[in-house]
């Protein structure tokens, strides 16, 4: 961790604090709203937000419509059996775990890199339960 990096910490996980003589220096141009604009949760990093396209079964789609993943989320198509959503975010572990929570009810259509990540996680899950 470089001293110039922005870090976030979960206060509920802290067990001890130590007061130091050294003070943190917040860059004069730092804008928290801008920094976290493309993030889900508290995890953010310097990087390009990706266009994510999801296909959700009817029940999952209803939930995703009312409990959006992110403020950039848009409904692109709504059919009887599924809906297609688009959002632009930084792909984080928090987002991946959110998708995994939908099990087989949500499919990542784009980007291919995220599809591959979820495929690998699903294969690991199957392997764990086969033994």
Located regions from the model:
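Core beta-strand-centered patch of the WYL/Sm-like small regulatory domain
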Residues: 1-44, 49-53
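Polybasic (Lys/Arg-rich)
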Residues: 37-131
């Amino acid at each position: 961790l470089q001293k110039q990096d922005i870090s976030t910490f979960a206060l509920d996980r802290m067990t001890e604090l130590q007061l130091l003589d050294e003070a943190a220096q917040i860059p004069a141009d730092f804008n928290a709203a801008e920094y976290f604009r493309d993030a889900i949760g508290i995890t953010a990093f310097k990087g390009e937000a990706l266009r994510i396209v999801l296909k959700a079964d009817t029940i999952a789609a209803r939930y995703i419509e009312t409990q959006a993943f992110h403020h950039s989320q848009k409904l692109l198509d709504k059919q009887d059996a599924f809906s297609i959503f688009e959002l632009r975010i930084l792909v984080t572990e928090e987002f991946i775990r959110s998708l995994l929570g939908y099990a087989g009810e949500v499919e990542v259509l784009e980007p291919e890199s995220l599809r591959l990540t979820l495929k690998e996680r699903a294969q690991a899950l199957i392997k764990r339960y086969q033994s």
